[in-house]
Amino acid sequence: EYFRQIPEVSKVLDIGCGPGFFSLLLASLGLKVTAADYSEGMLEKAKDLLNRNGYHNVEFCRADAQHLPFADASFDAVVSRNLVWNLEDPGAAYKEWLRVLKPGGKLFVFDGNHYCYLFNEDYASIQPKVNESSNHVLLGVKTNVIDDIARELPLSRQVRPQWDEDILSRLKAAEVKAEVLLWEGEENRLPVRFAVIAVK
């Protein structure tokens, strides 16, 4: 429903596209998609997914989300899913994403307070329920290694989406709003997953 706000034939940047789920959804809506990721492996998975589903007009680009290789005002919309939380300089990323948006363009960020529980007692108290409700399983992954990495990331210490709203407002976004996202039947008193929508 969020992406139906984007007019058809718009140019959209899917930053941190991963295996291409959002790119596929955006392409299916008739949008001109550029799928960007820092990982060549993820770009290959995204290409495979789009090609298998018959979308051969998507552009792919290896890019650092914090230093984009695109000209100013290149896109009508920028979308991101589960990326901002693991960036070393998320403020720089937001500045870049607004830079490549056309005036009036929209930014859609879907993210979460994935590692707040490492620093925040309230989040630590609900983490078992969060894992249960989201079927959060990392098969074959040493979670202690991930936790060690997350401890060094700036947004692991921030409660969001308030942080996102504040930084986007400081970066002069024309409009910013956030919505907490819940799984069916989930009732968290703290924001775990959320969407941030901004207009340049």
Predicted features and spans:
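Conserved alpha-helix/loop element of class I SAM-dependent methyltransferases that forms part
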Residues: E1-E8
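A short acidic, Gly/Pro-enriched loop at the edge of an enzyme's catalytic core
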Residues: Q66-A77
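A short SAM/SAH-binding and catalytic strip from SAM-dependent methyltransferases
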Residues: A77-P90
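Conserved class I S-adenosyl-L-methionine
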Residues: K106-G140
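Class I SAM-dependent methyltransferase SAM/SAH-binding core
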Residues: K11-I15, P19-H67
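A short glycine-rich, Lys/Arg-flanked "PGG" loop and its adjoining helix->strand segment in the class I
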Residues: G91-P103
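Conserved S-adenosyl-L-methionine
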Residues: A173-G185
